[in-house]
Amino acid sequence: MEGRRQRLLVFIFGALAITHLVQAQPPDQRGFISLDCGLPVNESPYTDPRTGLTFSSDADFILSGLRGEAGDDNTYIYRQYKDLRYFPDGIRNCYNLKVEQGINYLIRAGFGYGNYDGLNVYPKFDLHVGPNMWIAVDLEFGKDREIIYMTTSNLLQICLVKTGSTIPMISTLELRPLRNDSYLTQFGPLDLIYRRAYSSNSTGFIRYPDDIFDRKWDRYNEFETDVNTTLNVRSSSPFQVPEAVSRMGITPENASLPLRFYVSLDDDSDKVNVYFHFAEIQALRGNETREFDIELEEDIIQSAYSPTMLQSDTKYNLSPHKCSSGLCYLKLVRTPRSTLPPLISAIEAFKVVDFPYAETNPNDVAAMKDIEAFYGLKMISWQGDPCVPELLKWEDLKCSYTNKSTPPRIISLDLSSRGLKGVIAPAFQNLTELRKLDLSNNSFTGGVPEFLASMKSLSIINLNWNDLTGPLPKLLLDREKNGLKLTIQGNPKLCNDASCKNNNNQTYIVPVVASVASVLIIIAVLILILVFKKRRPTQVDSLPTVQHGLPNRPSIFTQTKRFTYSEVEALTDNFERVLGEGGFGVVYHGILNGTQPIAVKLLSQSSVQGYKEFKAEVELLLRVHHVNLVSLVGYCDEESNLALLYEYAPNGDLKQHLSGERGGSPLKWSSRLKIVVETAQGLEYLHTGCKPPMVHRDVKTTNILLDEHFQAKLADFGLSRSFPVGGETHVSTAVAGTPGYLDPEYYRTNRLNEKSDVYSFGIVLLEIITSRPVIQQTREKPHIAAWVGYMLTKGDIENVVDPRLNRDYEPTSVWKALEIAMSCVNPSSEKRPTMSQVTNELKQCLTLENSKRGVREDMGSRSSVEMSTSFTTEINPKAR
């Protein structure tokens, strides 16, 4: 008997010890995502000593951004606010987080600016959850932001979106799964306004490990009467309010008055959800009663409510409430039969956020992610939702939109000229609504996959200029007969069914004709040698368009001279003298006909430009002729050797003179004006003198060449595009151009028109006035237009104009040029002038400068600047 009793006591004490041990363990962090943004990978993970939370580096969850450290003035107490990540590049930068679908998550973003960049300018930007805007962040009044959101897929994207000149940044990103039967999210996500645990005896936060969901409860002093207990308070509700919160509370200082609270809103139209947390923590005598009404303005959430003894309970409004005048008044009103005043432990107040946009169809998103991973694509715009919001959709694709609540579908994908290699990825077939697929001008190998024929929505497939091999699938050829537009030029090893059979038949007769072919080849070579000895570069007649399946590139329709690669080598003395280097390749000096200097631009094998841009530039320069557009002497299109031969500009480009790279005296103000007037005339001709009209798309100071008389020649037409006339106002196209000069409206919308060139020209005009870089190479990277706009508010022209001019200018002329420039860079394209208006205004500006200073233009400048502007209506414009 005694032995049994001893064994029982051992069992009881052991059970108590195990229970105590279990209770001492911190809550499970399963499902938590705790990112210290910018934390070096070699310091990850670590355990926060204050909370016991394990934080990891964010490096595996985002592809962009740079690491920073908060300055010494950063007062945050948590380790994770020491590091940060900032995003100087791109508009939208997104974290990709794997979550459980259909679960309520608490999402918390933390910001510790700490003057990390030394600029002491608080960033402003937007935060998005998936395709929807969550909050506009202003870190001058900043704090951590928190939202409760039910996930709609297994991938959650949190995006920082640049909205102005400052750079978005973030210190910490945390996700905590909640119970779905607690907070109401069916009316929309819940953006936290405040979460207060009422007590006047303590400060700081209550969070994990006291709160198993890691909610941050702010101990808040309402200057009322404190109530607290040391007894255990149970929590059986889905909210599981931490015991540290439920053990304290407040009652009104005047027991006969209500407890009053309020919620302040940013907008009168905002709606709120309020959660009141109670627990009776005072021992009531037999004749005592605590009973009160819970009121949200005029609505009674619950009448005659009595808290449960030593057990937490939560009451809330079942539908979002709209308050008057931007303030919501909350009251706990004692009932007539109550002997005790109201008591409350905590309040959580949320704004109900409208997330109107459905995410892009998840199968389309998964397909795009697979394609991105398959080819190792790293594109700054390919972040966040592919289609939504429309202004931020991914480059190179188009989507169909039914309404905001219907997931968009991807209907067009253009991956041409992306340097893609390998086979055509199977993931393309998962874009089941795709109508147009352009994979041209890449290096795809292998056969044309049969799954393309099973993509029922496809109506256009462009596979030109790849290294595809083998026969075309029969099903695909059948689809072509029924309306599918299939182009496969430039794939010499690709054949349709008939041509493949012919190739097989030819294997039997090769021995018969081999000797004959050899003789014919020898004769042909001898004839070619004789021909080339008699003439140098030859006139090329127009050739018929090459149909798909033929091995040769389509010929460029031309009446100018086509050079062989060996001739180009001879003209440049085997590429002896380098003039410069750009995105196309290296530019060499050459001599034509023994006396005429020329510039030869040779396409490099690693060039970001491809045959498409080369062809576009040749075709444009063959049909446009203007004294302020660079003249094409000839071109080389031989196998992989591509070259453009231009008239030589011995004075380099405008950028070199503005930056001082070429040495010598800086350009005078009158010379700068003359150059921009001539450049404006060239652009005006492209916009109004060409049929169809053209947009240059890459106007910048490095593309303005200067001949021996310093006459301006606009160059580099590889990105030029025609634009619509008549009723249409724009053409939709993938964004192309140079950062800093790129029209921001075109960047956002992909809608191109001639006003995009006007914006770029305005930036050029600001450059010749200030001689400042378009984007300063500082961490903040201020843009020249923003800087000039700020300086002009002071009204002092000397702070804006290039100091190297030594005030040697007519101030009225400079002011007028500044006004023209600022009108050109207006954010709205509709408010920008046309190039014709700009040209006329600048001519007046130049006349004003010359007349005020008594300067007479030389004949060379007059012949260009004073040229008449009569335009032709013919298909081919007249030379000017």
Swiss-Prot record:
Region (Disordered): 854-880
Catalytic residues in the record: 698
Cleavable signal peptide: 1-24
Binding-site residues, ATP: 579-587, 601
Residues on Cytoplasmic side: 533-880
Keyword Magnesium: no
Phosphoserine PTM sites in chain numbering: 732
Record field: catalytic activity: L-seryl-[protein] + ATP = O-phospho-L-seryl-[protein] + ADP + H(+); L-threonyl-[protein] + ATP = O-phospho-L-threonyl-[protein] + ADP + H(+)
Membrane topology according to the record: Single-pass type I membrane protein
Modified residue annotations for Phosphothreonine: 564, 733, 738
CDD domains: STKc_IRAK
UniProt record similarity statement: Belongs to the protein kinase superfamily. Ser/Thr protein kinase family.
Protein name, entry field: Probable LRR receptor-like serine/threonine-protein kinase At2g28960
Record organism: Arabidopsis thaliana
Source species taxonomy: Eukaryota, Viridiplantae, Streptophyta, Embryophyta, Tracheophyta
